[in-house]
Amino acid sequence: MSEVRIAAEPRTEFGKGAARRARRAGKVPAVLYGHGIAPRHINLPGHDLMLALKTPNVLLRLEGVDEKESLVLPKSVQRDPIKGFLEHVDLLVVQRGEKVVVEVPLLVKGEVGAGGVLNLEMAQAEVRAEATRIPEGIEVDVDGLPIGTNVTAGDLKLPEGVELAMDPETIVMSVVAEAAPEATEEEEEGEAAE
């Protein structure tokens, strides 16, 4: 789990115009909430935040919000639908040692058995882990799995200290037979002539 330090500054202006001015200045408007505190509005440096959010479930250490640093998890990220720029972020305050529920990407390793194709039902699994020990991904070894095999959430090998937070019977991936190739027009015409 990676921790990234980001300097935050309190936001005093609100509304669409203020948010646009902040974005033009290279800042991203954000709201900080959780642990019984009143929601606080802050601005974060856009470039630093963009780089930090490239890591799944990154833990941010905000400086400049309180006397002490705040540990937060990005809960909701809004992006421009065309350009992909960050528009707004909701941040959840967490404590060291506190368990949180997050979605962790599944990392497929290996090749399925001959004639099979891996059908990925879910790209992420919901797990409960300490805020400072969230895994970056869960490896799933599919090497040599035969056709008809289902991998359920309960089959996932979770790191120490991480618990499953979803139904263990949920199918996350399965091995199916390859689809037969469609016949070309020439082959169909040849069969029809016979």
UniProtKB/Swiss-Prot annotation:
The keyword RNA-binding applies. One of its GO terms (molecular function) is structural constituent of ribosome. InterPro entries: Rbsml_bL25/Gln-tRNA_synth_N, Ribosomal_bL25/Gln-tRNA_synth, Ribosomal_bL25_b-dom, Ribosomal_bL25_C, Ribosomal_bL25_long, Ribosomal_L25_dom, Ribosomal_uL5_bac-type. It comes from the Bacteria. One of its GO terms (cellular component) is cytosolic large ribosomal subunit. Keywords: Ribonucleoprotein, Ribosomal protein, RNA-binding, rRNA-binding. GO terms for biological process: translation. Part of the 50S ribosomal subunit; part of the 5S rRNA/L5/L18/L25 subcomplex. Contacts the 5S rRNA. Binds to the 5S rRNA independently of L5 and L18. This is one of the proteins that binds to the 5S RNA in the ribosome where it forms part of the central protuberance. NCBIfam families: bL25_bact_ctc, PRK05618.2-1. Belongs to the bacterial ribosomal protein bL25 family. CTC subfamily. This is Large ribosomal subunit protein bL25. The gene is rplY.
